[in-house]
Design a protein with these regions (language model features):
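Catalytic domains of carbohydrate-active enzymes, especially glycoside hydrolases
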Residues: 64-81, 139-140
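Hydrophobic faces of well-ordered beta-strands that scaffold small-molecule active sites
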Residues: 47-53, 76-78, 112-117, 144-146, ...
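Acidic/histidine-rich catalytic cores of soluble enzymes
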Residues: 46, 65, 166-263, 267-268
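Glycine-rich, proline-tolerant flexible connector loops at the mouths of alpha/beta enzymes
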Residues: 77-100
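Short, acidic/polar
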Residues: 58-68, 124-135, 219-226
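C-terminal segment of N-terminal export signals and the immediately downstream linker at the start
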Residues: 27-50, 54-58, 66-67
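Active-site acidic/histidine proton-transfer and metal-coordination neighborhood
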Residues: 16-26, 63, 104-111, 117-207, ...
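N-terminal secretory signal peptides and thylakoid transit peptides that target proteins
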Residues: 2-20
Length: 305
């Protein structure tokens, strides 16, 4: 007799296959207005291999920018750094500070594709999200990244806040991006549910295979999960995973089958966009730099770059 875990997994796979079978017909990429494709984040520039600031989060953000430039990256995504908010850009960051972040990136030949400012309190309304959008625009960044859409009680309200935020962001040529992070948006089917409620051309999904494993305690393989978001994915946070709960890995050294995953993502319509390396094997700055170079080569080879 199957265990409860096996039954839960069968239910998940059944839902995933059902979503995947009809995904092309309801693809937000297919349905998006032509002007949405002109937004910087959604333009077809090929594969944009980049890196998050997370491996350098205990340093000033300029240290991370220097290292990423030295490692050969031209595209970066902003998250943790040694600031009063613990983020490079957060809702509490001023416009002037955000402008300075953008200038520091451009001085190093770096383009900012994504900005994660921490947990934006969507259930409290749209003020913090609008501040993030303003700050991203000031920095010349292409998108605001969100990692949650509230709990089951606030889910619909939070989706409404994001939809209204998308309307505001469109005026500033900014895209709002959601990636899986457990809770109500921890799997592909949950991400699709959010996307269907938000229903905006400048809303999109950044896939995160490491988080699919992490928040399912290793029970859900991202290769099985990703068909549920066919047509929605325009970027990937390149993160690996090792059980029981480790994502502090250089991509290609863990459990994620990246070649198989990329083949399935491409089948689902993900053919260009940011590929931002989020985590590296920890170590001193010299070690981190070496791992960043190794990870860049791995991702470039993965997509034939």
């Amino acid at each position: 007799m199957p265990t409860s875990d096996q039954l839960a997994r069968r239910t998940f796979l059944g839902r995933t296959l059902a979503f995947g079978a009809g995904a092309v017909a309801v693809s937000r990429l297919d349905a998006a207005p032509a002007d949405a494709a002109k937004l910087p984040y959604l333009q077809d520039r090929g594969w944009l291999v980049g890196c998050w600031t997370r491996p350098w989060a205990k340093f000033d953000y300029r240290v991370g920018m220097d290292a990423m430039a030295e490692a050969g990256f031209r595209y970066i995504a902003l998250t943790g750094a040694k600031t009063k908010t613990r983020r490079v850009i957060a809702p509490a960051t001023t416009l002037e500070e955000s402008e300075q972040v953008g200038e520091e990136a451009r001085k190093r030949g770096l383009t900012i594709t994504n900005v994660y400012g921490g947990g934006v309190p969507l259930h409290e309304g749209g003020e913090s999200l609008r501040k993030m959008i303003d700050n991203c625009a000031a920095a010349g960044a292409w998108s605001v990244l969100l990692a949650h859409v509230g709990n089951e009680e606030t889910f619909r309200e939070c989706c409404k806040t994001i939809a209204e935020g998308c309307d505001y962001a469109a005026e500033k040529r900014v895209v709002i991006v959601l990636k899986p992070h457990g809770g109500t948006t921890g799997t592909g089917p949950q991400l699709r549910r959010a996307a269907e409620l938000i229903d905006r051309a400048n809303f999109t999904v950044m896939y995160d295979p490491g988080n699919i494993y992490f928040y399912s305690d290793g029970q859900i393989d991202p290769v099985d999960d990703c068909p549920a978001v066919d047509g929605l994915i325009t970027g990937m946070s390149v993160k690996d995973y090792q059980p029981p709960k480790n994502v502090a890995l250089t991509p290609g050294t863990g459990q994620v089958d990246f070649p198989k995953l990329m083949a399935r993502l491409r089948q689902g319509g993900f053919t260009h966009g940011p590929l931002a390396i989020e985590c590296l094997a920890p170590g001193d700055p010299a070690h981190t730099l070496a791992e960043a170079k190794k990870a860049r080569r791995f991702v470039e080879e993965l997509v034939g770059g």
